[in-house]
Amino acid sequence: MSDILDYPDVSSPAAAPDLADLGGEPARARPSSHLQRLESESIHILREVAAEFRKPVMLYSIGKDSSVLLHLAMKAFAPGKPPFPLLHVDTTWKFREMIAFRDQRIRELGLDLLVHVNPDGVAQRVGPFSHGSARHTDVMKTQALRQALDAHGFDAAIGGARRDEEKSRAKERIFSHRSAAHRWDPKNQRPELWSLYNTMLAPGESMRVFPLSNWTELDIWDYILIERIPIVPLYFAAERPVVERDGALILVDDERMPLRPGEVPQWRSVRFRTLGCYPLTGAVPSTATTLPAIVQEMMASRSSEREGRVIDRDSTASMERKKAEGYF
């Protein structure tokens, strides 16, 4: 029996849009029954959030999972627009192509986007090189997210995290309760039976909601291929200037990156499996320039998509600690 329940009453009323060409390959005719169940479950969750919470928001980090989540939200509420704004927590160190893609997609879809930068972090000039990855992530991501949620009074934040990404996310509920201080207690999670979710909140508390919890990385790529979802070009292989640093291929994205003695950027064919702040995100050698090629590459891969994330190397259980402090 499948772990994913069928949601026959929440299918999308709109067909996938005919979007721009993504690598010169035709889209498949229909998704598999497995992907259809995942899609229906995610749409059901998105509609549940809209119905149950006073002021929800969708986190938009510009990556592949956010792109799928945004596509699902557009389907869930078609022909109207999603009844909640998008929020991007900008660390000021994102890849330039990510910001350009973000602005383009928001214009195309005509959505409301809130962008928040931690003003204290900017004043202190906190960055990954000057303060280290742990401090940078805490100030410019975790603290910034808490600031934005408090400033706007959001009681539910929708995100694109998946359980297969990392072990702390594997044990987190789809509707993940947060205290008034935005803290997550992994020992105090609510049961989720079938498609029944406990959305009750005490004053000051909030919920993080993960509609893609049951998706895998391969599911994401297969769905992007079938639905022809636009994604940041960084996911496709291309010749890019990188330096090999601490076991990771780091893209020299702008003049703020200081080169170590002896480092010389090399042009290599690379792409990214995951996207974050460019000094903290390693590329992978690849020749996959189309979506079908990426799917084939994923099917043969035996490594984690987060192997290039420098922040995951801070310490043992670093992700769980970050989440307990309010990280998404």
Swiss-Prot record:
> Which Pfam families would you find in this protein's record?
PAPS_reduct
Identify the keywords attached in UniProt to this record, alphabetized: ATP-binding, Nucleotide-binding, Nucleotidyltransferase, Transferase
Q: Which GO terms describe its molecular function?
A: ATP binding; sulfate adenylyltransferase (ATP) activity
Free-text function comment from the UniProt entry: With CysN forms the ATP sulfurylase (ATPS) that catalyzes the adenylation of sulfate producing adenosine 5'-phosphosulfate (APS) and diphosphate, the first enzymatic step in sulfur assimilation pathway. APS synthesis involves the formation of a high-energy phosphoric-sulfuric acid anhydride bond driven by GTP hydrolysis by CysN coupled to ATP hydrolysis by CysD.
Question: Could you tell me which residues belong to the region Disordered?
Answer: 15-34, 304-328
User: Domain of life here?
Assistant: Bacteria
InterPro entries from the entry?
PAPS_reduct_dom (IPR002500), Rossmann-like_a/b/a_fold (IPR014729), SO4_adenylTrfase_ssu (IPR011784), Sulfate_adenylyltrnsfr_sub2 (IPR050128)
Q: What is its EC number?
A: 2.7.7.4
Q: Which reaction does it catalyse?
A: sulfate + ATP + H(+) = adenosine 5'-phosphosulfate + diphosphate
Its ancestry begins with:
Bacteria, Pseudomonadati, Pseudomonadota, Alphaproteobacteria, Hyphomicrobiales
Of which family is this protein a member? Belongs to the PAPS reductase family. CysD subfamily.
Protein name stated in the entry: Sulfate adenylyltransferase subunit 2
Q: Its annotated pathway?
A: Sulfur metabolism; hydrogen sulfide biosynthesis; sulfite from sulfate: step 1/3
Q: Which GO terms describe its biological process?
A: hydrogen sulfide biosynthetic process; sulfate assimilation
Subunit info here reads: Heterodimer composed of CysD, the smaller subunit, and CysN.
Give yes or no: UniProt keyword ATP-binding: yes
